[in-house]
Design a protein with these regions (language model features):
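Peripheral, non-AAA+ core regions of ATP-driven protein-machinery
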Residues: 1-212, 216-219, 223, 326, ...
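Short beta-strand elements
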Residues: 18-24, 277, 380-383
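Short glycine-/polar-rich loops that comprise or flank the Walker A/P-loop
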Residues: 29, 61, 100-101, 130-131, ...
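Conserved ASCE/P-loop NTPase catalytic core
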Residues: 34, 108, 199-366
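Basic, amphipathic alpha-helical bundle interface domains used for macromolecular binding and assembly
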Residues: 34-45, 58-60, 67-77, 285, ...
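Alpha-helical scaffold elements adjacent to nucleotide-binding pockets in ATP/GTP-utilizing enzyme cores
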Residues: 47, 51, 84, 123-127, ...
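Short glycine-centered helix-capping/turn motifs at secondary-structure transition points
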Residues: 93-94, 166, 295-296, 321, ...
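Proline-centered turn/helix-capping motifs that create local helix->coil transitions or kinks
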Residues: 162-174, 236-237, 249-255, 349, ...
Length: 506
């Protein structure tokens, strides 16, 4: 007999539908799986047989062939266990074939027949259309976020068999709540002093401008960066689904609702490999940190300590908002629309106090050159962060709260969307004159900086985008960008070099 059962596998951060075709025929008992299964799928033969027998069902004493169609593309993971087990029982005559119509099955089987959750249920459920989806109870909430059809959670293979045979109704339990992964957001009011850096955070959030914080150890660069997440608006439905699917595919914890709605914040260690940061791997296409930060903040602390090859791998994703990964038999595109924030010391020794740098010119040049010019050029904001003064540290008066600043950020983003349909960092040079025209005095200021070799052509475009955001943050629609907006944007393009040189426009 023959049976075809719907299921899905994970491919990068996307689900791919798979038809599990099972043929049971006379012959010496055997159990073969074909259709490019990987090692975890081949191992399912033993898991499935033990789970079926532990559930009280009879195992066919015939030749069993399982084909995973379509045969192109390697099938990975243990999520096909449940579909294979149901397919064997249908093809063997234990379950009527009519009972599995318009049903799809995802889940790993334990040897005792228990159903275990697998990573990537959200994108796999999204790939199965409007089919009713049978999943482990631990994956039900995640599946319901994206599934178009009804979700039927189960805890044991026996429950699924009894429901399909009509002996008992579907259990239809309430899904288990997911582990809490949405940690509280640190408040901006906790930052003492740092008026320029606080202003830079607000501008970065309002215009989605990449930002580099330059300062000595203990200046508060990490503290500032962690407050940026709270200034960003909640993700829209489309981006929230994309972020949820990426987190699900990577096996990362999801918030209790099952949907990633708050902008993610990822801070990988500087020893991270290219595969960890960008994504990929030798045997799978696992999302990297830049995809896990999709819709939020990717924070690279001690950015100059990352391997230059790893940093250069960020250039294409930052430009396109997606990561393209190619392997010999695999190709995937992962979402990677992030706000990049880097933090670094001004020199290898840290340069804590003015005139205290002990680094020679050669050491300083090597340190600075670890960040390539093309990557450095992608930072619209380069801000010097000094250690706060004693009076600022001892001041009992809190600064503006995250809620107050986030309201201004949201209003500025609304202005940009109404004007040009996107954030200001996405303005192409051809549209700057239309959407970010300069008043005459602002144009003279920019001209002066260019003539004195303090601003390049590409830097000029970035200054105009930042100035457009600063103008929007005034809270009132402004047709032109004022001189004061350009002056503030120029202040936020610090050079990288000796501490004494920081502050020059570049």
């Amino acid at each position: 007999m023959f049976a075809s059962i719907s299921s899905a596998v994970l491919f990068g951060a996307e689900g791919q539908p798979v038809n599990v075709e099972v043929h049971v025929d006379k012959g010496l008992p055997a159990f073969n799986v074909v259709g490019l299964p990987d090692e975890s799928v081949r191992e399912s033969r033993d898991r499935v047989r033990a789970a079926v027998m532990s559930s009280g069902a009879s195992w066919p004493r015939h030749r069993i062939t399982v084909n995973l169609a379509p045969s192109r593309g390697r099938k990975t993971g243990s999520g096909l266990d449940l579909a294979i087990a149901i397919g064997v029982l249908v093809a063997g005559g234990s379950i009527p074939i009519e009972s599995v119509r318009n049903l799809a099955f995802i889940g790993e089987l334990g040897l005792d027949g228990s159903l275990r959750p697998v990573p990537g249920v959200a994108p796999m459920a999204g790939a199965l259309g409007d089919a009713e989806l049978v999943v482990p109870i631990g994956s039900a909430l995640e599946a319901r976020v994206v599934a178009l059809g009804r979700t039927r959670p189960a805890a044991h293979l026996r429950e699924v068999i009894e429901a399909l045979m009509g002996d008992l109704p579907w259990p239809d339990r309430e899904p288990e709540p997911l582990p809490v992964a949405d940690e509280p957001v640190s408040d901006l009011s906790e930052v003492r002093g740092q008026p320029l850096a606080r202003r830079a955070l607000e501008i970065a959030a309002a215009g989605a401008h990449h930002m580099l914080l330059i300062g000595p150890p203990g200046a508060g660069k990490t503290m500032l960066a962690t407050r940026l997440r709270g200034l960003l608006p909640l993700l829209g439905r489309k981006q929230a689904l994309e972020a949820t699917m990426v987190h699900s595919a990577a096996g990362a914890p999801l918030p209790p609702s099952g949907l990633v709605q708050r902008a993610p914040f990822r801070a990988p260690h500087h020893s991270s490999s290219a595969a960890a940061l960008i994504g990929g791997g030798s045997h799978s296409l696992r999302p990297g940190e830049i995809s896990l930060a999709h819709g939020g903040v990717l924070f690279l602390d001690e950015i100059a300590e990352f391997a230059p090859k790893v940093l250069n791998g960020l250039r294409q994703p930052l430009e396109d908002g997606t990561v393209r990964i190619d392997r010999s038999r695999m190709h995937a595109e992962l979402p990677a629309n992030v706000l990049l924030v880097g933090a670094m010391n001004p020199c290898p020794c840290g340069g804590g106090a003015p005139g205290a740098c002990q680094c020679g010119d050669a050491a300083l040049n090597r340190y600075v050159q670890r960040i390539s010019g093309p990557l450095l050029d992608r930072f619209d904001l380069r801000v010097n962060v000094n250690r706060p003064a004693v009076d600022d540290l001892l001041d009992d008066q809190p600064g503006e709260s995250t809620a107050v600043v986030a309201a201004r950020v949201a209003a500025a983003r609304d202005l940009a969307w109404m004007r040009q349909g996107g954030v200001n960092s996405e303005l192409v040079p051809a549209h700057l004159e239309q959407f970010a025209p300069l008043e005459s005095s602002a144009r003279l200021l920019v001209r002066h900086e260019i003539e004195h070799d303090r601003l390049s052509g590409r830097g000029y475009h970035r200054v105009r985008r930042v100035a457009r955001t600063i103008a929007d943050l005034r809270g009132e629609p402004s047709e032109v960008v004022l001189e004061q907006d350009v002056a503030m944007a120029l202040r936020m393009r610090a050079s990288i070099g000796r501490p004494s040189a920081i502050g020059r426009v570049a």
